[in-house]
Curated annotation (Swiss-Prot):
Ca(2+) binds at D43, N45, D47, D54. This is Myosin light chain 5. GO terms for cellular component: cytoplasm; cytosol; muscle myosin complex. It comes from Homo sapiens. Myosin is a hexamer of 2 heavy chains and 4 light chains. Keywords: Calcium, Metal-binding, Motor protein, Muscle protein, Myosin, Repeat. Expressed in fetal skeletal muscle and retina. One of its GO terms (biological process) is regulation of muscle contraction. Residues 30-65, 100-135, 136-171 form the EF-hand domain.
Amino acid sequence: MASRKTKKKEGGALRAQRASSNVFSNFEQTQIQEFKEAFTLMDQNRDGFIDKEDLKDTYASLGKTNVKDDELDAMLKEASGPINFTMFLNLFGEKLSGTDAEETILNAFKMLDPDGKGKINKEYIKRLLMSQADKMTAEEVDQMFQFASIDVAGNLDYKALSYVITHGEEKEE
């Protein structure tokens, strides 16, 4: 008869296995396919795992060659083990589960729009994002603005941006 300790270990391993297999139920089939494509692009040596060299090569292919080893190590440490596709999905599942709902994002923007016009000056938002809380870089803010609707007066349509942030695409009128 197996000892209690052995049974407990086996049960924990099964629970961990079930938890990682449930990650697929957190995503739609199309999302899983998109993640698989991204994983395949990053797995440069095609061994089924993303390692430090794969990350370096991926960054290089994006034109960023000055990534430090400690930055890559920090990325890899976010995973609890080797990064195969299931682990890759787990990591994204954890990141995406922290994404604010559209209403929460809208409410945050509304705090900066006392007149309720649905628009905020782009330069004002940029200054806030680069100087408050989790400070963003100018590059990160500019990337975000690529998905924003900005009028000729330089005002950001935050309702449209909130939709893009939470749904990944512009709302069709």
